[in-house]
Amino acid sequence: EQVMQYGEDDLTFVSRLLSEVGIWFRFATDARLKIEVVEFYDDQSGYERGLTLPLRHPSGLFDGETEAVWGLNTAYSVVEKSVTTRDYNYRTATAEMMTEQHDATGGDNTTYGEAYHYADNFLQKGDKEAAESGAFYARIRHERYLNEQAILQGQSTSSLLMPGLEIRVQGDDAPAVFRKGVLITGVTASAARDRSYELTFTAIPYSERYGYRPALIPRPVMAGTLPARVTSTVKNDIYAHIDKDGRYRVNLDFDRDTWKPGYESLWVRQSRPYAGDTYGLHLPLLAGTEVSIAFEEGNPDRPYIAGVKHDSAH
């Protein structure tokens, strides 16, 4: 119904929205403009490539002046074989909204089971290429599961390691997955008087079939209701601004921004005691009336008018 920020700072809010659609970002320096920029990617085109390091453990403070990696570890988990999503859209209430099982592995027989997710906030079933459709979310979710299938770790003296970098490790003793190429997803740097500079990194196997997906940041859970007032496009209007589907626009009390009158929110549905295709009960609300806004499954993006209240002004 809308996109709402509540109880979260700006970075968390933006990161949450990006994580839901599988977009990751990084900070970089624009060499031409000489300014810091933020780059957003959702596929392998954003990876940095071309770094190959040998497998070699440094000796104390002496690393032979050669950047290398060591202490390589791999951890494997069985993840879901496919993902199915489903949602409900009252605008097309009879439309089939459950997607087919999506398998992004291309036939990997080490995966098992099906993950079923409801209410991913999509309006149509669509296909895997249709942005923010049911099939799109099924694909993104399965790729996120596959990112957890193999978690790789290691240490390095290379200052070039950073998230989004693909590296290969040379050496017959290196695990095959590192020799084929891995994508760095996180780094931690450390140094001390009695130790040389080193990085601890985490990575996932590089894949052309699917890319890195950031961990899903959970939405805030809206407990109870929030107060709001029904609005209109006309000042001192006798009736509120209402559309053909009986929806209203409301001004949420916590919102500090100033909006054009009658456009403080997107259209919000109203819960009624009686409704049908050719019958129902609708008592029109007046501009300024206090209403209680509830949220489907506590989702801040799915508000509806749950009730109307008297107050000192109305």
Tell where the protein language model's regions lie, with residue ranges:
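Amphipathic alpha-helical and helix-coil boundary elements used as assembly
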Residues: 1-314
